[in-house]
Design a protein with these regions (language model features):
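A short, conserved structural fragment
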Residues: 56-74, 139-158
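Residues in the recognition helix of alpha-helical DNA-binding motifs
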Residues: 15, 58, 137, 169
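Short acidic, hydrophobic short linear motifs in intrinsically disordered regions
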Residues: 23-47, 112-128
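A contiguous pocket-lining binding segment that forms or flanks enzyme active sites
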Residues: 103, 116-155
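Short, amphipathic alpha-helical interaction segments positioned at domain boundaries
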Residues: 77-117, 164-188
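Positively charged, polyanion-binding regions of nucleic-acid-associated proteins
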Residues: 6-28, 94-112, 138-143
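Intrinsically disordered, low-complexity serine/threonine- and proline-rich regulatory segments
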Residues: 1-15, 21, 25, 59-95
Length: 189
């Protein structure tokens, strides 16, 4: 069963996944480092301005659901965090290869994206040969028989776009009938 993450929880898990690949020597992350990662102005959509209290509260909730591990150093009083959503220490039945890990990370950090956008943004996480490799890796995370349990869904192609977008369902089931950006009054810049 997929977790139903809040927007903040999805961002924090995405940050922990990203930093485990891009800065593995800094893992696990301190509260300050995780807050800074969540509030980055680049490579995030939407940009957030979370306080350390909000991050700490969300991390406690994630730890209760065993989606993160909190390593507490009682001598220094510093807690450090690592994700357990996927990988060897996962408590959720999510096993991802490197390409899929990159895709899920980017979807958690930036929301719905096309294969071209995922490929362009994945450089530090994984190098995709082409957009077809992205689409193949993302499609492997889709379960057509039970779409409500798919980690990823393919959204209909939005008007004016060449490609359909992919979106994660770790924050709840996504309405696959409406392309992202097609909601009333929403216009992309």
């Amino acid at each position: 069963m997929l977790p139903n993450l809040s927007e903040i929880e999805a961002r924090l898990i995405g940050c922990l996944m990203e930093k485990s690949v891009t800065t593995p020597d800094q893992m696990p992350l301190t509260l300050n480092a995780l807050t800074n990662a969540a509030n980055q102005k680049s490579a995030r959509d939407p940009v957030m301005a979370l306080t350390q209290s909000e991050v700490q509260r969300a991390m406690r909730a994630l730890a209760q659901r065993r989606l993160v591990q909190i390593d507490e150093n009682f001598k220094t009083g510093v807690a450090k965090y690592r994700q357990r959503l996927c990988g060897a220490t996962s408590f959720v039945d999510i096993q991802l290869d490197c390409a899929q890990f990159a895709i899920v990370t980017l979807l958690l950090l930036r929301g719905a994206q096309t294969p071209g956008e995922l490929r362009a943004r994945a450089g530090r996480l994984y190098t995709f040969a082409d957009n077809n490799e992205v689409a193949t890796a993302a499609s492997a995370l889709i379960d057509d028989d039970t779409p409500e349990t798919s980690i990823v869904v393919r959204l209909p192609r939005a008007k004016g776009r060449k490609e359909a977008q992919f979106m994660h369902q770790l924050a709840g089931e996504v309405d696959r009938s409406v392309p992202v950006g097609a909601e009333a009054g929403h216009h992309e810049a």
